[in-house]
């Protein structure tokens, strides 16, 4: 036992004056971890830069450092190995309820729900290092404000049942895993900057499935923790987490697919510097398009703000508000009807 100085990667004797009240489930020890390597290989597929990135991410999650402001999202089909990875790390760091560093939270904390209790759950983040949540339902939407709050590094306010609110400095890192990526109700650069999408491709077939893997991984926990510490050192001395091309491309693709306003502009609007369209007509067209496509309909005020964020200006003439630089496309003319009596 003892204390790991994460700045040096060394195990030193614990001192009472440090007032450490949490501990991992195992003591780190160098050694191979082939089973865990096989779990990670499903992600990095032998790409050394992606492999090193994953270890830096896991190493950073040992710390309470909040400078990176990252939300990790592991996604892929069911039976792809995501749960095995997350549960192994959580087991190594120990359950926060029992004096460890890992804590599970409800995904409803970060997605829109009818009975919104996300802010009530913030207190569950206090003191944790590795926070994880499982996303299981398709069609959910990110609660952008709370996601940015949870990974923004700012002081948080939480409240326990029957207690007064209390403030605390965050120490956690947020990992979410699931089969479906939540939707974004609006293009959000804050989410894009923080989001790291890690894809688990393929599925584990019945022939590949090993029901003993989770138990056999336990023997590798000390070595895995040792490698996480090495990843933490790499993060500190290599200039930060970095974001491999695969991760950045996945985020760009995701954001493009969630950009409903951009899709409407491409499909329904001509961009002509000398033209303008009334704000009311533009919004009614967008609303009809969004409803027809099952998309989220933002308010007219938010619609105008999002257009301004994309560089479109507004003007007013004769009591009518206009959006400059756009013109609604004319609807396609219906095909001519053919009356056999006209022959």
Set out the residue ranges of the language-model regions.
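Feature primarily recognizes SF3-like P-loop helicase cores of small DNA viruses
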Residues: 1-80, 84-343
């Amino acid at each position: 036992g003892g204390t790991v100085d994460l700045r040096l990667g060394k195990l030193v004797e614990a001192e009472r004056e440090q007032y450490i009240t949490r501990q991992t489930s195992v003591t780190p020890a160098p050694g191979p971890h082939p089973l865990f390597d096989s779990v990670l290989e499903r992600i990095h597929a032998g790409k050394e830069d992606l492999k090193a990135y994953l270890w830096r991410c896991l190493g950073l999650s040992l710390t309470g450092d909040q400078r990176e402001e990252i939300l990790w999202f592991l996604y892929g089909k069911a039976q792809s190995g995501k749960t095995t990875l997350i549960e192994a790390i959580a087991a190594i760091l120990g359950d926060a309820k029992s004096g460890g560093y890992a804590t599970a939270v409800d995904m409803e904390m970060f997605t829109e729900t009818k009975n919104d209790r996300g802010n009530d759950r913030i207190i569950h983040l206090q003191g944790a290092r590795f926070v994880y949540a499982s996303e299981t339902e398709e069609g959910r939407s990110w609660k952008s404000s709370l996601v940015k709050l949870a990974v923004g590094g700012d002081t948080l306010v939480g409240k326990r049942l029957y207690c007064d609110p209390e403030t605390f400095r965050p120490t956690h890192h947020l990992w979410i895993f699931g089969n479906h990526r939540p939707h974004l109700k609006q293009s959000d650069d804050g989410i894009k900057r923080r989001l790291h999408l890690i894809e688990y491709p393929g599925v584990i077939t019945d022939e590949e499935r090993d029901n003993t893997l989770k138990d056999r991984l336990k023997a590798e926990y000390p070595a895995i923790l040792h490698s996480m510490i090495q990843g933490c050192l790499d993060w500190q001395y290599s200039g930060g987490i970095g974001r491999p091309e695969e991760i950045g491309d996945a985020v760009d693709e995701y954001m493009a697919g969630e950009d409903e306003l951009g899709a409407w502009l491409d499909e329904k609007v001509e961009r002509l510097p000398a033209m303008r369209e009334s704000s009311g007509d533009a919004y009614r067209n967008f609303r009809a398009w969004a409803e027809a496509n099952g998309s989220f309909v933002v308010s007219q005020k938010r619609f105008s703000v999002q257009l301004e964020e994309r560089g479109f200006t507004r003007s007013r003439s004769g009591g009518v508000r206009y959006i400059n630089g756009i013109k609604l496309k004319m609807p396609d003319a219906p095909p001519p009807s053919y009356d056999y009596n006209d022959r």
